[in-house]
């Protein structure tokens, strides 16, 4: 009522409201009401500035223009670059800028994290939190890590560059195919990498034996009797592929990228699908006493968890 009463008042149009932690002592529904009310006020001539520690106070619509204020012993209080400005710095063409903003803005948690872990697919996003907590006894929130799903790997390099421009440490988890289809283009592997070449020869052997279709020496889904993801898993299981894949894994790890050495996360966890029922059942299994014995690659998962923790340590 007050807004409607004064909306034409020139003095009110320059009113600045400064609010510290408007979400304090409120239940989630009330926090949402406050957020909406402040948003409405900002559209009615008020200038609203609020400080918050709650991801609920910042929607994906506002992530890219939010200011990130941090404090540490080395730098004192400082402001990180806005996501919108970082994207413009890294991505030059406007359509790609919009795509990148949409991809990263979908996770408002990264605004409150000291460290971001990018994932390629939804499986990692759905099962890694429970898996990580079961293996380490710590949650992602406890190590101040935001798990951000990309929905694909084509933007991995640019996403990492944007977050680096925002002064946010970042690591990424990708499927094995990334090393063969994108890592060279992104500059993480040399074009003539000997380990990639060796594994490419193994693809040719599989294509001859299994009548698979390759395009530019790589497995594809179209017009092939075996899905590309399955072919990568088949190649990764070959004894002669173990050393070159391990080499590829180590090269990418040094650059902040974890590649699944068995093809994809499903092979390491023994998952037989990519749907909510499979993910939910796995998260329930995480709570069982004999869970560790059921993992096909416990050692690899334990190493991954330590790698994630090491990434959080690099932020201090």
Where are these regions (language model features)?
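Switch/communication elements of ASCE P-loop NTPase nucleotide-binding domains
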Residues: 1-106, 310
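Acidic, Mg2+-coordinating catalytic modules of nucleic-acid enzymes
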Residues: 100, 104-118, 122-316
